[in-house]
Amino acid sequence: MSLNYIKNFYEGCVKPPTVIGQFHTLFFGSIRIFFLGVLGFAVYGNEALHFICDPDKREVNLFCYNQFRPITPQVSFSALQLVIVLVPGALFHLYAACKSINQECILQKPIYTIIYILSVLLRISLAAIAFWLQIYLFGFQVKSLYLCDARSLGENMIIRCMVPEHFEKTIFLIAINTFTTITILLFVAEIFEIIFRRLYFPFRQ
């Protein structure tokens, strides 16, 4: 019986009841994971080692880098954002697997439809919060020069630091923000698809 639960859970996660949900999981989600795993770590892999300030002292470089990048690397935050957004859907499919609910029944029975819509709304909320945090922490652009306030180190001045591969990081930020925006739009479109199919279903009976 436990193997059947695992099978139902896997099928629910891989093949959600909506067409848009399937597109997000199988196609768009895969592209986003590939983008994070391959390009993200290639751009941010050795950022701390190449972050150099003037004067070039280890403690100054480390202090200013921590000030410049509050969460390191930025790819980790993006990966965490992706996982958190997927949690509500995974919990719903776990519930459906434990109740032995077929994917076809989710949009046919009102109680299951409401629960699924709530999980999508929760995904939208989490994605919006993560998007706001991403913009607040990282912005939309990475500049080549960072001015570090090093007064707490006893350096009574603003220290200039060079940011490595700033152009590539800017492109990565734009891409991540675009992915997040598309994700939110897909979740909203999924709700409209559910409503349409719920309204259309009685006419097929």
Curated annotation (Swiss-Prot):
One of its GO terms (biological process) is organ growth. Residues 1-23, 98-112, 192-205 are cytoplasmic. It comes from the Eukaryota. Disulfide bonds join C53-C161, C64-C148. Residues 45-76, 134-170 are extracellular. One of its GO terms (molecular function) is gap junction channel activity. It is found in: Cell membrane. Not detected in lens or retina. Gene3D superfamilies: Gap junction channel protein cysteine-rich domain (1.20.1440.80). It holds the Pfam family Connexin. Keywords: Cell membrane, Disulfide bond, Membrane, Transmembrane, Transmembrane helix. It is a multi-pass membrane protein. The chain crosses the membrane at residues 24-44, 77-97, 113-133, 171-191. One of its GO terms (cellular component) is connexin complex. InterPro entries: Connexin (IPR000500), Connexin_CCC (IPR019570), Connexin_N (IPR013092), Connexin_N_sf (IPR038359). Mediates calcium-independent ATP release, suggesting activity as a hemichannel. Does not form functional gap junctions. A connexon is composed of a hexamer of connexins. Belongs to the connexin family. Beta-type (group I) subfamily. This is Gap junction epsilon-1 protein. It comes from Homo sapiens.
